[in-house]
């Protein structure tokens, strides 16, 4: 068995222990970042006088050959390859010779090497996730614009509450996703720092220029403390927290649409492309994609919880427990890379049913408007709330809708009711009264959409 550390040991590793500790099965996906970091390191130690220019160039040439094998799918992982670092260095030695390949790791530890790989990988995947999130926001804007004229019940406690435009509901998710995007940008300011050169825990003894390394790797700055650099994974925890919050937002969207797909609601119909059938019941059209979007939130929360539990009691500095960070990170990123484009496709291709939404509107949704009517007549709101409660009870006693309650009945409860009360019973007027910023009036939503378009086009 070939390892990077075997000199002081008199016994070979137990095969059971080797299988248990090897991480090549999952960290191999860091191959490109690992090679990129190693090329930058070769340049850095050449600048520090530890390599000749010819040695540097030969190392870089060999590393690019290893990269080409990974890219073409021809790289062969050996049973002795402990992790991606071991695998790449082993293959590099086979290509350019072990003596020269052995110089590459001068002054470098796998502790700063792996965290460099992860930060490089995370930077790339975060950019792709950001693009996918923006596309989902664009899908929300498209649906909001198309559904501007559609009125529907808004809900609290899953009970019909007030009439709103479908566009207001859709834009609610846009703004959740906008905050998700801002959180991603914010966390990446802290994640996008160069750790290379921190060594195992105490720094580098060869005067390697870490700022030049950072520039070479595209990092805006370096990490500031070697012990902190190699031992903490808070940047991954932030990413997993972000992923969990975004997952919850996707779950809430899925929960709404899953409910609305039922025959009892009938507000939307999913595309056949995003539905499945039953192995027993031929009539079924199941919203499996939505249900799994909802279920994946639990997975993302689990990824965060798992890593929090791993790091909570670790003494400084590096511990092999931190090997557990990558599977959680990869899982969260993979989950969202699948979920975000699917959610966008569901929104774009579902059919909404304005007639069913309109049919769900009933006079009781205008009870607040009736209370507001009395407020405009000079009654304090708390009193108007109580008065309208009595009106609702009287309509229920008579078994008629609120709008059909005779004026005489209304005036028996409050003399402030007059002929103009009939104007209350209009859903379009109701939504148009809510024209304050953020409200459901057309003009207010148009302002939101205009703001949203600027944000996705920045």
PLM feature spans:
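Glycine-rich cofactor/substrate-binding loops
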Residues: 1-37, 281-458
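Charged, flexible cofactor/metal-binding loops and thiol motifs
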Residues: 118-119, 123, 130, 145, ...
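A structural signal for small-residue-enriched, beta-sheet-centric alpha/beta enzyme cores
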Residues: 110, 223-227, 363
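Structural signal for hydrophobic packing residues in well-ordered secondary-structure cores
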Residues: 46, 63-74, 92, 96, ...
């Amino acid at each position: 068995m070939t390892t990077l550390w075997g000199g002081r040991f008199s016994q070979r590793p137990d095969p059971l222990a080797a299988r248990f500790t090897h991480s090549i099965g999952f960290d191999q996906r860091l191959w490109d970042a690992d090679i990129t970091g190693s090329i930058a390191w070769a340049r850095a130690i050449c600048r520090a006088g530890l390599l000749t220019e010819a040695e540097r160039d030969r190392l870089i040439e060999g590393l690019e050959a290893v990269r080409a094998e990974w890219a073409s799918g021809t790289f062969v992982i050996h049973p002795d390859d402990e992790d991606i670092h071991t695998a790449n260095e082993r293959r590099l030695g086979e290509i350019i010779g072990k003596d020269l390949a052995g110089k590459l790791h001068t002054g470098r530890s796998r502790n700063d090497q792996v965290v460099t790989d992860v930060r490089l990988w995370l930077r790339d995947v975060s950019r792709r996730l950001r693009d996918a999130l923006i596309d989902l926001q664009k899908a929300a804007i498209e649906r909001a614009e198309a559904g501007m004229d559609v009125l529907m019940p808004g809900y609290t406690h899953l009970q019909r509450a007030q009439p709103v435009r479908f566009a207001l509901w859709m834009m609610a998710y846009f703004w959740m996703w906008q905050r998700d995007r801002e959180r991603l940008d914010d966390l990446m300011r802290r994640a996008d720092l160069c750790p290379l050169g921190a060594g195992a825990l105490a720094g580098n003894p060869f005067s390697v220029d870490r700022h030049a390394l950072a520039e070479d790797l595209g990092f805006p700055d370096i990490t500031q403390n070697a012990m902190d650099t190699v031992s903490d994974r808070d940047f991954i925890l932030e990413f997993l927290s972000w992923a969990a919050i975004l997952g919850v937002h996707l779950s809430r969207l899925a929960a709404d649409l899953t409910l609305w797909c039922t025959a009892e609601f009938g507000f939307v119909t999913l595309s056949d492309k995003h539905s499945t059938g039953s192995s027993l019941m031929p009539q079924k059209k199941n919203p499996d994609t939505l249900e799994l979007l909802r279920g994946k939130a639990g997975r993302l929360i689990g990824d965060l919880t798992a890593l929090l539990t791993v790091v909570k009691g670790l003494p400084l500095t590096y511990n092999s427990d931190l090997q557990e960070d990558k599977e959680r990170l990869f899982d969260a990123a993979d989950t969202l890379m699948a979920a975000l484009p699917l959610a966008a496709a569901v929104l774009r291709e579902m059919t909404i049913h304005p007639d069913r939404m309109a049919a769900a509107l009933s006079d009781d949704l205008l009870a607040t408007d009736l209370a507001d009517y009395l407020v405009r007549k000079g009654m304090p709101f708390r009193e108007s709330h109580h008065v309208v409660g009595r009106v609702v009870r009287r309509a229920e006693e008579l078994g008629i809708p609120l709008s059909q309650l005779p004026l005489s009945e209304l005036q028996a409860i409050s003399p402030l009711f007059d002929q103009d009360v009939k104007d209350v019973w209009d859903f379009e007027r109701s939504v148009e009264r809510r024209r304050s910023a953020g409200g459901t009036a057309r003009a207010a939503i148009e302002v939101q959409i205009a703001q949203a378009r600027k944000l996705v086009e920045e």
